[in-house]
Amino acid sequence: LVLSLHACDTATDMAMGLGIRSKAKAIVCVPCCHKDILKQYSYDPFRMITRHGILKARLADTLTDGLRAAYLEGMGYKVSMIEYISPLETPKNIMIRAVYTGKKNKKSMEEYEELKKMIHVNPAIERFV
């Protein structure tokens, strides 16, 4: 089991990378900051939204965790995301749960690669696997 709680920015990716490398039976992460993708991504059709810093940051949170989920699925994990606590307690309330199946998901990895290219990012998770 690999577990991380409020690991800031790429520290979550480090934990996930450790889990993937060791073929951990389960990975449970509660991400915190999402600065890595925030600094990288751009997508012209969203420029009217992303010119507002707060909206760009919230979209970066979603993109980061969505990419993480797709990558984990591609590497053989069944992934679920849940709100583990009320958003009134903390807005950083997403828990990523991944259970190792051993069956790599080619479609998820293709979608991951496609989204990466579309938004011009190099997610940190790849550096830690």
Show which residues each predicted segment covers.
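Class I S-adenosyl-L-methionine
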Residues: L1-V129
